[in-house]
């Protein structure tokens, strides 16, 4: 009888140990290194007065994901601030470059900590003289995202990818279909690539189903390919099934960060100055 009780207790101990190991494995997810590459970290600094979204998240990676995916909704995030004491995430359309006077140090680090992350994927590393294009993925099979292109004359194309809602820990091909011009968002009618098109890159999703590829130069000439209105498809590598797609368009003003805003502001000031000069001249 005693032997049977000991056997049962040993079995229960074994089961609880296995459950503890499984639970521990679930909690310790590997970091998405590509996600982290898109951010420049500075401890105990923040941007004052320019939050456009605040939410409750436990881990900093969740906050960084929110920042990157905001571009899918055409709300450009230039920085993210995570307050671990309060499980709070604040994303902003400004950073220490666009608003240096509002970038201040937390003067009460003993009370709470602020982790500041500048989004360095908002613009390509080589942004001088580039034209910007984008393909907004429609998410008709669950995934949604944006693929951004930047190219200057005589140089290869730079590409950046953010896609969420895909199958976790899986490989996907980003394919360019040169012979298709989709109208009215009908690219979802294709189900397989059947060997057509060109694979621009392969991306890997993390445990949340998110794929990130920071800006990288690829062997592709967008000008030569005349990419406007051509189709980009996201293909699950193992099955060669198309899971997402979008047509390439000129990037919207909100897709370009401080460069667009600065040039627009300069143009507005110049136009205003001309109007003032003209009015003064008329009244002389």
From Swiss-Prot:
SUPFAM superfamilies: Hairpin loop containing domain-like. Keywords: Disulfide bond, Glycoprotein, Membrane, Signal, Transmembrane, Transmembrane helix. It is found in: Membrane. The chain crosses the membrane at residues 264-284. Pfam families: PAN_1. Disulfide bonds join 38-121, 63-89, 67-77. Glycans are attached at residue 256. Residues 1-20 form the signal peptide. The keyword Disulfide bond applies. It is a single-pass membrane protein. Residues 38-121 form the Apple domain. One of its GO terms (cellular component) is membrane. This is Uncharacterized protein C34C12.7. It comes from Caenorhabditis elegans.
